[in-house]
Each structure stands twice: as structure tokens, then as C-alpha cells.
């Protein structure tokens, strides 16, 4: 019984983490209110591609990746 409970808990955590990754990819890109002009990549859910954009350096959301590879790895469609 304890093993079953542990197994279910692990599965729920893994599913929740995967859902969170997809949720981040569905967010619109937010450049934030600052003016740092940092080149980043964000996933565009409408086109299904990662795009290079300019991030202001503060606030924004999780749809922001340092490299194209990071963006592709996080947001590749299944």
C-alpha cells in the first residue's frame, strides 16, 4: 500500500512538472518595463516556433529562454 501511494505521488509530480512546462510555452512573450535590450528566445504558440526577441531585463514571464536550443527543448510540440 505504501509503495502504491509513493508511485502515485511520483507520477503526479512528473505530470505536474510537464504541465507547467507546457503552460510556460503557451504564455505570450512579455518584454517587461525595463530597458536592458537583452536578446532572448520565446515560444510563439500561434506559429509553433521559437523567435528571437528583446527582453527589457525585469519582470516579464517564464516564456523567455537564453538560447534557441533551450526554447526548442522546452517547447517542442509532442
From Swiss-Prot:
Protein name (record): Kunitz-type serine protease inhibitor conotoxin Cal9.1a
InterPro entries, per the entry: Kunitz_BPTI (IPR002223), Kunitz_BPTI_sf (IPR036880), TFPI/VKTCI-like (IPR050098)
Pfam families attached to this UniProt entry: Kunitz_BPTI (PF00014)
Site (Reactive bond for chymotrypsin): 35-36
Chief location of this protein within or outside the cell: secreted
Cysteine pairings via disulfide bonds: 25-75, 34-58, 50-71
GO function terms (MF aspect): serine-type endopeptidase inhibitor activity; toxin activity
Similarity comment: family membership: Belongs to the venom Kunitz-type family.
CDD domains: Kunitz-type (cd00109)
Comment block on domains: The cysteine framework is IX (C-C-C-C-C-C).
Species annotation: Californiconus californicus (California cone)
GO annotation, cellular component aspect: extracellular region
